[in-house]
Amino acid sequence: MCNTPTYCDLGKAAKDVFNKGYGFGMVKIDLKTKSCSGVEFSTSGHAYTDTGKASGNLETKYKVCNYGLTFTQKWNTDNTLGTEISWENKLAEGLKLTLDTIFVPNTGKKSGKLKASYRRDCFSLGSNVDIDFSGPTIYGWAVLAFEGWLAGYQMSFDTAKSKLSQNNFALGYKAADFQLHTHVNDGTEFGGSIYQKVNERIETSINLAWTAGSNNTRFGIAAKYKLDCRTSLSAKVNNASLIGLGYTQTLRPGVKLTLSALIDGKNFNAGGHKVGLGFELEA
């Protein structure tokens, strides 16, 4: 078993309550399907109501389970091509090696990353290295777990300048229905979040963040309520008086509709509110 989260997944439950079930200012469509040969296809498109700009992407994924290989190809409307090859749980249980490349045909620009991660019950660690001969940037992270407590560190080192460009710490606690997460980024940005699963229907979350040398404190609360197995309501508000509301309805197995709205509580009569529509189809 490899239950220790990665550094980026620390506090994920609280983030999901704040972020999932909303899509302000856009119309979004997500489609997922799988062929008889095992190739997974997923595509998404969204159009912003403010600007009218539309974009989309297509992803195909094929797994060779006997060898632990996964091949992923990506394309988006910015004409960026991506290829990812990963090898997992073969050299060692919990070890994943990945080659991720990006190619932009219009400009000829090429970039890539080598990634490695290793996850076990009591720890997880990983590293990414940019493929850049002029001076790659090295990213690294580690998370230790002990009786529900989690401690993490994340860094990035710019070899061209020979200095740390990122230096982050995190500390938290995770239980079945409760999670606490705190973090410090580069010694100047501080934040924390609390997640509570009240019961099978209600989830709540609180987050707080501030920057050293600034009076700009950010605070928000969010909740999700499941009316039944097909319907859920979401709501959130922050100290800027921005109120988010979301409604998610499973129309039938594999078909989901999401409606959301962002209301400016300080300027309620002035307009400027945003609405969103999302449609997910999986077959």
Curated annotation (Swiss-Prot):
Signal peptide location: none
Modified residue annotations for Phosphoserine: 241
Phenotypic effect of disruption: Male Vdac3-deficient mice are infertile as a result of reduced sperm mobility due to an abnormal mitochondrial sheat in spermatozoa.
Domain of life: Eukaryota
Glycyl lysine isopeptide (Lys-Gly) (interchain with G-Cter in ubiquitin) cross-link, chain position(s): 53, 109-110, 266
Organs and tissues of expression: Highest levels of expression detected in testis, less but still abundant expression in heart, kidney, brain, and skeletal muscle.
Residue positions where Phosphothreonine is found in the record: 4
Keywords: Acetylation, Differentiation, Ion transport, Isopeptide bond, Membrane, Mitochondrion, Mitochondrion outer membrane, NAD, Nucleotide-binding, Phosphoprotein, Porin, Spermatogenesis, Transmembrane, Transmembrane beta strand, Transport, Ubl conjugation
GO term, biological process aspect, one: neuron-neuron synaptic transmission
Residues annotated with N-acetylcysteine modification: 2
Subcellular location per the Swiss-Prot or TrEMBL entry: Mitochondrion outer membrane; Membrane
Transmembrane segments: 26-35, 39-47, 54-64, 69-76, 80-89, 95-104, 111-120, 123-130, 137-145, 150-158, 163-175, 178-185, 189-198, 202-211, 218-227, 231-238, 242-251, 254-263, 273-282
PTM: Ubiquitinated by PRKN during mitophagy, leading to its degradation and enhancement of mitophagy. Deubiquitinated by USP30.
Any Pfam family the entry gives: Porin_3
Catalytic activity: chloride(in) = chloride(out); K(+)(in) = K(+)(out)
GO cellular component terms, semicolon-separated: mitochondrial inner membrane; mitochondrial outer membrane; mitochondrion; pore complex; synapse
Cited PROSITE patterns: EUKARYOTIC_PORIN (PS00558)
N6-acetyllysine, modified sites: 12, 15, 20, 90, 266
GO molecular function, one term: porin activity
Binding-site residues for NAD(+), renumbered to this chain: 242-244, 260-264
Assigned protein family: Belongs to the eukaryotic mitochondrial porin family.
Function text: Non-selective voltage-gated ion channel that mediates the transport of anions and cations through the mitochondrion outer membrane and plasma membrane. Forms a high-conducting channel with a stable open state and a voltage-induced closure with a mild preference for anions over cations. Involved in male fertility and sperm mitochondrial sheath formation.
Domain notes: Consists mainly of a membrane-spanning beta-barrel formed by 19 beta-strands.
Oligomer and partners: Interacts with ARMC12 in a TBC1D21-dependent manner. Interacts with MISFA.
Name of this protein: Non-selective voltage-gated ion channel VDAC3
Species of the source: Mus musculus
